[in-house]
Amino acid sequence: MIELIPAIDIIDGKCVRLSQGDYDSKKVYNENPVEVAKEMEAHGIRRLHVVDLDGAASHHVVNYNVLNRITSQTSLIVDFGGGVKSDEDLKIAFENGAQMVTGGSIAVKNPELFCHWLEVYGSEKIILGADVKDRKIAVNGWKDESACELFPFLKEYVEKGIQKVICTDISCDGMLQGPSIELYKAMLEKYTDLYLIASGGVSSMEDIRALETAGVPAVIFGKALYEGRITLKEIERMMQDY
């Protein structure tokens, strides 16, 4: 079964969504992310993807209090990303209840530090974030495109022991036009043991089933849930079917 991971993106302590990573497109869905997390848990969700968008923009973790409230008031397994750029940021994330931390920009800009984290904490706790636009890695909250090509970038980190990768196609994210299934298929063909977490573009349960059919192990979804195109009841039913 494909692992179903809803996302909570945070700006100013509120649950928001962007379109294609554009901060000007911000839409607030709920003032209280903890209530959102509790509702998800009540419908059988076990894992949550929490993104500190303020952190991503300001290059250090900002919304750790929200992370702490979610992890202390629910039993959800939380993977956390956004602004984790230093040992101190990583420590803050783990101390506030994150079970896993995603590093994206840091893996491009400071690979030595990211690899150190991988060695110290292991591939169960450190996730590689590969945010792509035209198959190039984007950094700094998706505002900048790097010269890193996706497949050489993946190869480098797979060889260093990374096992879990969240891959977001920025052109799809928040657009509700379907995920980049062909991209994910190509990644899985090349790296058969990768625990690939698809992110971006999911607009319906059909999209989730299509990813599952393509062999994608896990999916992150957000806007479709907040816009009512996917309901928590549907997610609960899908999990009960297995």
Task: Give residue ranges: language-model regions.
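Glycine/small-residue-rich loop that forms an oxyanion/phosphate-binding "nest" at active or ligand-binding sites
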Residues: 54, 62-119
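Catalytic cores of alpha/beta
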Residues: 74, 78-100, 182-218
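Conserved beta-strand positions in the central sheet of alpha/beta enzyme cores
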Residues: 49-52, 79, 102-103, 127, ...
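Conserved, mostly hydrophobic/aromatic
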Residues: 9, 40, 48, 93, ...
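Conserved anion-binding
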Residues: 12-15, 20-24, 98-173
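Glycine-rich phosphate-binding active-site loops on the catalytic face of alpha/beta enzymes
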Residues: 84, 92-113, 169-171, 200-203, ...
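Charged helix-capping and loop-helix junction motifs
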Residues: 61-68, 143-152, 177-185
